[in-house]
């Protein structure tokens, strides 16, 4: 039996709560100092719930970066695709970036301050940095 829409929304809400808690932990401790215990405590879940959604703290870290960059890029794509003047497009891009930064300043700061030398096997968020 397929999950109901309500169940899907609840799972997504739990996952987002984990990511929000993890963001606080990573900002405070870095990836090296963060643990799944810290993330569980900050997000208000048990470790088993975290491991249901993520294999490791590196996976949580990667998900925050990938989702954050994806959100930024998807917000900017329509402006880039617009056929307006370069000057107006540039101004619209700056305004949109400022809006994103104001809406989630902690995430925005994290995305731009996350160490660039992270040695994770898979770094899917980098795709958004190089577009």
Per-region residue spans from a language model:
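Hydrophobic alpha-helical connector segments
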Residues: 63, 77-103
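Amphipathic alpha-helical packing segments from all-alpha helical-bundle domains
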Residues: 70-73, 77, 121-131
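Short hydrophobic/aromatic patch on the recognition helix
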Residues: 44-54
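Short coil/turn segments at alpha/beta junctions that flank glycine-rich nucleotide-binding fingerprints
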Residues: 28-32, 83, 104
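Residue-level detection of the helix-turn-helix DNA-binding "recognition helix"
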Residues: 41, 55-56, 66
């Amino acid at each position: 039996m397929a999950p109901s829409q309500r169940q899907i929304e609840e799972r997504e809400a739990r996952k987002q709560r984990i990511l929000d808690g993890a963001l606080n932990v990573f900002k405070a401790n870095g990836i090296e100092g963060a643990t799944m215990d810290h993330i569980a405590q900050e997000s208000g879940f048990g470790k088993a719930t975290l491991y249901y959604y993520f294999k490791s703290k590196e996976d949580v870290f990667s998900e925050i970066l990938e989702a954050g960059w994806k959100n930024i890029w998807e917000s900017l794509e329509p402006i880039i695709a617009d056929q307006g003047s370069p000057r107006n497009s540039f101004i619209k891009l700056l305004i949109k970036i400022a809006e994103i930064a104001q809406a989630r300043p902690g995430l925005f700061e994290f995305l731009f301050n996350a160490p660039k030398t992270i040695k994770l096997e898979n770094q899917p968020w980098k795709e958004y940095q190089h577009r």
